[in-house]
Amino acid sequence: MRDPIDVYNNALVPMVVEQSSRGERAFDIYSRLLRERIIFLTGPVEDYGASLIVAQLLFLEAENPKKEISFYINSPGGVVTSGLSIYDTMQFIRCPVTTLCVGQAASMGSLLLTAGEPGHRFALPNARIMVHQPSGGFQGQATDILIHAREIEALKRRLNEIYVKHTGRDYDTIHTALERDNFMTADAAKEFGLIDEVIEKRPEPAAA
């Protein structure tokens, strides 16, 4: 598996040049969109990328604690604890966080998608959403393996409780839905309660 940080660092990131009274300023495209309060989760959820997203959330809250943040998600999931650090920060800050799935939101990606501001959780028409229980592997002494198995069970219960909170489904329904890889269309995810709307086009701005 390629290191996601190497992939990002070696990628050709478009630059945006702006003119001002002080001359030209160049921004990479993600920094420019951050000025518009747009942040991204692209690729696997892991510690370094999660810390960048947490930092962006905290920065935008410090700039304006009442203004909406748009969080675009295209992720196959990844490390549970990394995802939970993003989740907890989304719940912690005062800004409402709108979530939008483009491409896919699987595993921890789906949890972050459904954790957005109620009424403001969206997916594009061809997005795919997948939920399942956490998985992990461990080698070592039998006692340590049992300890890790209990930890995975505890994480499974906690993740189920988070889905219950944000979907409005009862615990047994969530438990059953997450027992195996459960792929959904955007419409099915809306019916299940993971998102609020499937959107094809950006809404027109309200008339002044």
UniProtKB/Swiss-Prot annotation:
List the catalytic residues: S107, H132
The answer to keyword Cytoplasm applying to this record is yes
Give the Enzyme Commission number.
Answer: 3.4.21.92
All disulfide bonds of the chain are: none
GO molecular-function terms, A-Z: ATP-dependent peptidase activity; ATPase binding; serine-type endopeptidase activity
- Give the SUPFAM superfamilies listed for this entry: ClpP/crotonase
**Which biological process annotations from GO are given for this protein?**
protein quality control for misfolded or incompletely synthesized proteins
Q: Function, please?
A: Cleaves peptides in various proteins in a process that requires ATP hydrolysis. Has a chymotrypsin-like activity. Plays a major role in the degradation of misfolded proteins.
- What name does UniProt use for this protein? ATP-dependent Clp protease proteolytic subunit
Please name the source species: Methylobacterium radiotolerans (strain ATCC 27329 / DSM 1819 / JCM 2831 / NBRC 15690 / NCIMB 10815 / 0-1)
Name the lineage.
Answer: Bacteria, Pseudomonadati, Pseudomonadota, Alphaproteobacteria, Hyphomicrobiales
